[in-house]
């Protein structure tokens, strides 16, 4: 449906797999993610991404490589945080990039959330968005993602502008995007990740709504 509507890429995510596990997930999740991702890869001709919650970046990279996906969305790639799943005490960049090279998956791009949603960031409170983006760039990400505090929350316009000015990496807006905000966001950001706004009543846990999908496509064309 999304590919037919004209979307540039799609992202597979175990969003309904509540409550999320922190960093390490079981073989049943890896297996299900592989089957689902491969089915999407086979069904569309646009790039396919994958995120395995919460912060299971090694597993996501493995699945993306095996299933033929193109990129992964990561949490905790650089810097620590305290999230609803627990403490993300160690940044993942060093081990993850070495693992990517080891399995021959250098073609898989890494999109990194700069500040994990549903998390406290007191550990990095003395760092600006520009600092975090610069550090994430230095750590080896291929793109950075700016979000609001929770799923469906709009990202701060100031944060997006600061991120875009801080690094040559593509800046993606990763939450709270809707048909009204989309044109303005695309004047600053390289792209957006749209989830809740595509669903019935704007709720992430509902089914896709063809009318909402059409409004997003129209907003992008008008922007």
Where are the regions that the model predicts?
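Hydrophobic faces of well-ordered beta-strands that scaffold small-molecule active sites
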Residues: 10-12, 48-52, 72-74, 108-114, ...
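Conserved anion-binding
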Residues: 58, 63-143
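Catalytic cores of alpha/beta
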Residues: 50, 55-68, 132, 163-166, ...
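Active-site beta-loop-alpha junctions enriched in small/polar residues
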Residues: 15-17, 51-57, 77-79, 113-119, ...
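Alpha-helix-loop-beta-strand connector modules within alpha/beta enzyme cores
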Residues: 21-50, 90-112, 155-178, 211-223
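Conserved, mostly hydrophobic/aromatic
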Residues: 2, 10, 72, 136, ...
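Internal alpha/beta core interface subdomains
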Residues: 9, 130-147, 153-170, 186
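Glycine-rich, proline-tolerant flexible connector loops at the mouths of alpha/beta enzymes
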Residues: 6-32, 79-86, 141-157, 201-203
């Amino acid at each position: 449906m999304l590919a037919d509507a004209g979307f540039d890429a799609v992202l597979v995510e175990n969003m309904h797999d509540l409550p999320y596990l922190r960093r390490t997930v079981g073989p049943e999740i890896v297996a299900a993610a592989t089957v689902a991702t491969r089915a999407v890869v086979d069904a569309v001709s646009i790039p396919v991404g994958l995120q395995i919650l919460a912060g299971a970046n090694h597993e996501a990279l493995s699945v993306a490589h095996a299933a033929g996906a193109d990129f992964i969305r990561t949490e905790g790639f650089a810097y620590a945080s305290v999230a609803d799943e627990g403490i993300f005490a160690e940044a993942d960049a060093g081990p993850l990039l070495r693992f990517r090279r080891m399995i021959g998956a250098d073609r898989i791009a890494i999109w990194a959330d700069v500040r994990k949603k549903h998390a406290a960031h007191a550990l990095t409170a003395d760092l600006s968005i520009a600092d975090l983006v610069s550090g994430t760039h230095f750590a080896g990400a291929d793109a950075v993602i700016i979000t609001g505090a929770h799923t469906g929350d709009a990202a701060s316009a100031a944060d997006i502008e600061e991120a875009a000015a801080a690094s040559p990496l593509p800046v993606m807006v990763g939450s709270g995007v809707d048909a009204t905000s989309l044109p303005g966001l695309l004047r600053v950001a390289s792209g957006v990740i749209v989830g809740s706004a595509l669903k019935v009543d704007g709720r992430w846990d509902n089914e896709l709504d063809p009318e909402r999908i059409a409004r997003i496509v129209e907003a992008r064309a008008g922007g």
